[in-house]
């Protein structure tokens, strides 16, 4: 009996544990897609989300641009598109077998077939021999409309030239055919156009669509303000403002010098107009306001010149205390007078008066006058504030004045004129990675700071290559160019790095190459000849090669290189 009770107890515990274990492992229900059983509960599987109508739909992050989401992070692209998120155009003309027997032109999301000269495009897409088209000698084939031969162009962005046989590009940006969203500018291409973000904006995927987002140059450090200025981000750009105590345009800020003169004490000036002269004895040329108080600079005391009036000799003290001098108002018109602080006198003694030499009514006759004319002193500046000079007549011992450097001086310092420069820290700077290559140039973080480009690892067994192209375009120069760059080809069987230039059609033989070595090296190459259309860096790697190919600090200058290395 005890054995049976123990067996029943063990069986119940086992069934309970089995039920709990089954609840921890979700199992998908075969009859429903996206539904899983979590023990006794049924819910959407991982990577699926329940919609408002109750069904479970797969979730793809980021979203499929030209396709539909059929599973967790799995897109099914529409015809003509490829990529993980269906955001890349599929080049159908490069597929094998080719979709067209004669000429094939890839378009965005599709392709078009064209016939060779002497053939006509039929409604089913095939090419049929047509003697009339061979005689027309059209660039992209022809079509017969109502018995008339007409050459055709493969894209709406192309139109027939005046000769009626060739096709020329239509500038959609200039003609107004293009319509770009806000914050994007139109850039014409051959046969089409693209909408590119304005300078100061980056194309980002926000809110389920691509938008041009403002770049905060201040937080990223991509500004050229003075070290004595602050950077303020604005929409699409930034501005620089000098800090307090500095002045300038923000790109260049100069310190504002502060000049202070120690006052000696207040002297009350009585009401009325007066003139205090500046001459060889150090007086200030200053006209006070009515009833104002003036703080003169420290100057030695000069005793006044006494007139011949019968006055007593004043009693002076070594350090006189400035006191207000009461003066009765004289009869008009008043002469220009010079008043100086006098030592205190006894009440019964009259105050000595100093009268100027200016001839005016009311001047007492027989008085000894003082010349109040402004003396010519070319070695001293005039004004309310004076900057004291040193004995050598030099101001630069007091203030630090920054000497400006003109553009001509900089051109003399650097005789090679820069055409292009890129360190790949903030992008490719106009360099283009060819998408048709098996390998690609990828940016990688440099332990010393910044970024450099490296060739991705090969996955296929055959020989693979990655090309990096700089189209010169408007930078094209009629003379020689100096190409300078840093590079490394390290490791066992690392591969090969080569430099090419393209002038007309395909590029020629390699101008330079490296297939081994240790560490970074600096190389300069003179690109000789005119009409260089593009510069190409080619990196080749094979599967299983463990080495690394690196490229950084590429620049182009006009003229010959100072030394080839």
Swiss-Prot record:
Recorded GO CC terms: extracellular region; membrane
Motif residue range(s): Integrin interaction: 382-384
UniProt KW keywords: Calcium, Cell adhesion, Developmental protein, Differentiation, Disulfide bond, EGF-like domain, Extracellular matrix, Repeat, Secreted, Signal
Covalent S-S links between cysteines:
56-69, 60-75, 77-86, 93-104, 100-113, 115-127, 173-186, 180-195, 197-212, 218-231, 225-240, 242-253
**Quick one: where is this thing mainly located?**
secreted
- Which InterPro entries would you find in this protein's record? ConA-like_dom_sf, EGF-like_Ca-bd_dom, EGF-like_dom, EGF-type_Asp/Asn_hydroxyl_site, EGF_Ca-bd_CS, EGF_dom, Growth_fac_rcpt_cys_sf, MAM_dom
Question: Is the Transmembrane helix keyword given for this protein?
Answer: no
Q: Does the keyword Secreted apply?
A: yes
Record-linked CDD domains: EGF_CA, MAM
The secretion signal range is 1-19
Give the subcellular location.
Answer: Secreted, Extracellular space, Extracellular matrix
- One function term, GO molecular function aspect: calcium ion binding
Q: What ranges does the record give for the region Disordered, renumbered to this chain? A: 301-373
Q: Ranges for the EGF-like domain?
A: 52-87, 89-128, 132-168, 169-213, 214-254
Compositional bias annotation for Pro residues = 317-349
Which residue numbers delimit the MAM domain?
420-563
Biased amino acid composition, Low complexity: 304-316
| GO biological processes | cell adhesion; cell differentiation
Purpose: Functional ligand of integrin alpha-8/beta-1 in kidney development. Regulates the expression of GDNF with integrin alpha-8/beta-1 which is essential for kidney development. May also play a role in the development and function of various tissues, regulating cell adhesion, spreading and survival through the binding of several integrins.
Give the family this protein belongs to, as stated in its UniProt record.
Belongs to the nephronectin family.
- Oligomeric state and partners? Homodimer and homotrimer.
* Comment text on domains: The MAM domain is required for localization at the cell surface.
> This protein is called what?
Nephronectin
Give the originating organism: Pongo abelii
Organism lineage reads as: Eukaryota, Metazoa, Chordata, Craniata, Vertebrata
What is this protein's gene name? Answer: NPNT
